[in-house]
Amino acid sequence: MTKRVTIIDVKDYVGQEVTIGAWVANKSGKGKIAFLQLRDGTAFFQGVAFKPNFVEKFGEEVGLEKFDVIKRLSQETSVYVTGIVKEDERSKFGYELDITDIEVIGESQDYPITPKEHGTDFLMDNRHLWLRSRKQVAVLQIRNAIIYATYEFFDKNGFMKFDSPILSGNAAEDSTELFETDYFGTPAYLSQSGQLYLEAGAMALGRVFDFGPVFRAEKSKTRRHLTEFWMMDAEYSYLTHDESLDLQEAYVKALLQGVLDRAPQALETLERDTELLKRYIAEPFKRITYDQAIDLLQEHENDEDADYEHLEHGDDFGSPHETWISNHFGVPTFVMNYPAAIKAFYMKPVPGNPERVLCADLLAPEGYGEIIGGSMREEDYDALVAKMDELGMDRTEYEFYLDLRKYGTVPHGGFGIGIERMVTFAAGTKHIREAIPFPRMLHRIKP
């Protein structure tokens, strides 16, 4: 019995006969030769079958029958294919399989997603099948590399995984984007972020991170928004603002390096410019203040490439502004110290300037916009209560959060990153819907 291996590992078996469990992604050939494009989730590569070889091995009757099976294979038929691994310099993968035997496991008739072009709605309706395509597999491999690198980075930096709840009894700071559900007769809400709970974790464990799904009822149809997505939140006690920015920069660079190391073929499939990714890792990220960014936007608003509306100090950025800023510097760019009026209640003011808060958004270049948001948290009980009263917030909804300031408060801060936005940036894809297996968007909840 031959050894069963995955496609990605065939390089270790050159000259040997192996068996691979795979699906037929495509098929071509004529006469005495057949070419199979095979995939198994780890990689794609080609298998070649020669009719004379089958006749020689199995005899004329059985050999012709087996070769006829290969000729009749349809797209996405599942098979066990056996063959000799050979190096192939013509192939991007570098190897091919000289097929010696095949066994059909599951037939596939009239597969909906043929090699021709299909519309987006059709592909999204068949997302469960579209996932199998070469480019979609590549994007999900990059997603996997980013998730793996996330756990690796925080483990190396002394953070503990801390699981915050998905159901919450209190509305977060933006109640207009909440999904509400009934919790045994009491209103409950799907989590928008685990941050408030992570702050409790940081007071117990020092450094914590959470990774899980969050939900925002955003009635937005842009290429950067989902109603359900995966968020990594980190929280760190005894932290300064500069230390937080350093950590965020190191984290994003670790994610990019993780993709380069663990998913090089996926990047090649997507034709991602890896030299750009390497430059983002090598060069320091740019850091500017919100007010410097506004000044810069005003200075260049009449430039030919300035496709954005005029902003005054105090206004929030839109996507065109974020795109222009990050493209202007050509590297990921931190915009720091936003106006308190457009940021969350828990953010700590800039010392000596209460109109600005110690926060930063990291803007990715190439038009990908914000991928990280972070801030120092207000650790002073009286200052936080005053801010909540100013905004008309109900303190009773945040009793546990205020307790953190009453019992051993410390300087602390953190940040969050939407994994799908990071995947989109790393993969170089145009729309966030491809960065998650089953996207949930406005008007899209199936399959």
Curated annotation (Swiss-Prot):
What EC numbers are recorded for this enzyme? 6.1.1.22
- Alphabetically, which GO biological process terms does the record hold? asparaginyl-tRNA aminoacylation
Cell compartment(s), UniProt:
Cytoplasm
The top EC class, named as a word, is ligase
Cite the GO molecular-function annotations of the record: asparagine-tRNA ligase activity; ATP binding; catalytic activity, acting on a protein; nucleic acid binding; transferase activity
Keywords attached to this entry? Aminoacyl-tRNA synthetase, ATP-binding, Cytoplasm, Ligase, Nucleotide-binding, Protein biosynthesis
Q: Which PANTHER family match?
A: ASPARAGINE--TRNA LIGASE, MITOCHONDRIAL-RELATED, ASPARTYL/LYSYL-TRNA SYNTHETASE
Q: Its quaternary structure?
A: Homodimer.
Name it: Asparagine--tRNA ligase
Q: Which organism is it from?
A: Streptococcus pneumoniae serotype 4 (strain ATCC BAA-334 / TIGR4)
